[in-house]
From Swiss-Prot:
Residues 24-76 form a propeptide. Keywords: Disulfide bond, Hormone, Secreted, Signal. This is Protein RALF-like 34. Disulfide bonds join C94-C107, C121-C127. Expressed in roots, stems and leaves. GO terms for molecular function: hormone activity. Cell signaling peptide that may regulate plant stress, growth, and development. Mediates a rapid alkalinization of extracellular space by mediating a transient increase in the cytoplasmic Ca(2+) concentration leading to a calcium-dependent signaling events through a cell surface receptor and a concomitant activation of some intracellular mitogen-activated protein kinases.
Length: 129
């Protein structure tokens, strides 16, 4: 019994030694490149192609480290679905020109416009309300 456990221990140590040697030899091969944990991609969406003096800047400063956690929620994929009730024929989701959003829950019971127009005159609106 002692001889069989000694043989088992010897075989396990030999297999461990061979696997360690094999994993080290893979990293020496110049055709294989090991990727780091994170890619150096731009963190923010708005300034990902900022060009300063002809060079693209993709550097993240220490000040931005607290912001990256907040912005990471932006990069998650979300799926939006339209309900079968909204797709049904001959159904107007909300009265036209009511100022209510199509996404307002039960917009026929809601009173008053959601976002009333309160901007002043400009050359675009030509003071029309």
């Amino acid at each position: 019994m002692a001889a069989s456990s000694l043989n088992l221990l010897l075989i396990l140590s030999l297999l461990t030694f061979i696997s360690l040697q094999r994993s080290e030899s893979l990293s020496d091969n110049p055709s294989l490149t090991l990727l780091p944990d994170g890619f150096d991609w731009p963190i923010s969406h708005s300034d990902e192609f900022d060009i300063i003096d002809g060079e693209e800047s993709f550097e993240v400063t220490e000040e931005d480290d607290g912001v990256t956690d907040r912005r990471s929620l932006y990069w998650r994929r979300t799926k939006y679905y339209i309900s079968y009730g909204a797709l049904s024929a001959n159904r107007v989701p909300c009265p036209p020109r009511s100022g209510r959003s199509y996404y307002t829950h039960n917009c026929f019971r809601a009173r008053g416009p959601v976002h009333p127009y309160s901007r002043g005159c400009s050359s675009i609106t030509r003071c029309r309300r």
